[in-house]
């Protein structure tokens, strides 16, 4: 379900596998948070574990957990003030209406647990993105969210006509989503960058699950994106 990437006295960074629920679903103790907590507490380095952000079930990649209440409060403030830089990778098989830029708008509940992007801007979801051509008419997206809305990145790409491959909600009409080749939802939490108690931290984690994430074309592309914060991002 996960592997530990890094630990300090105040927090732990893990790599979440794809198709793993963050919370318990059905069986108590079966969710990701419960499993991480069980593992970290068994090491005897802390007495409690606190979630500070989350990933959807289909999404793999980097997650941070606080190891004490003070750290949890600090991280809560960092996320609230958007001082944790988050970068994601996604693959779509549909030509987008625009290849880079800004996706911005309020989000509202739709049908079947879905959300939709609105044209209003009262409390908008904000996402910057670049995209890169890949083989087999696929397109790689590097995404930088500036808000933390439910399904934000999935809705953002769907709104420009490029739903994420394997997304069970937003890619129902995608060219290849229903074919056996699709072995996961292709969204991955790739990088985190933040300052905590005066020290700077950077974490980069390329995906290691999914056939499309293992292709030579994909590997060549992300070699050029190993410091995503250095790119000339579209204006907010």
Where are these regions (language model features)?
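Short, solvent-exposed secondary-structure boundary/capping segments
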Residues: 137-143, 215
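Glycine- and acidic-residue-rich catalytic/RNA-contacting loop of pseudouridine synthases
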Residues: 20-34, 38, 74, 92-139, ...
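A short alpha->loop->secondary-structure connector
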Residues: 28-32, 79-86
């Amino acid at each position: 379900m996960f592997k530990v990437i890094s630990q300090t006295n105040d927090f732990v960074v893990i790599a979440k596998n794809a198709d793993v629920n963050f919370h318990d679903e059905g069986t108590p103790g079966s969710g990701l948070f419960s499993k991480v907590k069980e593992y970290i507490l068994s090491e005897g380095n802390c007495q409690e574990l606190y979630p500070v952000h989350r990933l959807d079930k289909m999404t793999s990649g980097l997650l941070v957990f606080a190891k004490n209440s003070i750290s949890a409060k600090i991280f809560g403030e960092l996320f609230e003030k958007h001082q944790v830089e988050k970068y994601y990778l996604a693959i779509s098989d549909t030509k987008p209406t625009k290849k880079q830029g800004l996706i911005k708008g309020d989000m509202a509940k739709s049908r079947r647990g879905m959300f939709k992007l609105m044209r209003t801007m009262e409390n908008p979801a904000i996402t910057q993105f670049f995209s890169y051509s890949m083989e087999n008419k696929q397109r790689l997206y590097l995404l930088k969210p500036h808000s933390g809305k439910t399904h934000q990145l999935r809705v953002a790409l769907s709104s420009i006509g490029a739903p994420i491959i394997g997304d069970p909600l937003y890619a129902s009409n995608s060219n290849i989503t229903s074919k056996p080749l699709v072995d996961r939802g292709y969204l991955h939490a790739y990088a985190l960058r933040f300052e905590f108690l005066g020290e700077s931290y950077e974490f980069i984690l390329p995906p290691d699950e999914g056939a499309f994430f293992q292709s030579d074309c994909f590997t060549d592309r992300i070699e050029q994106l190993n410091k995503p914060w250095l790119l000339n991002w579209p204006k907010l």
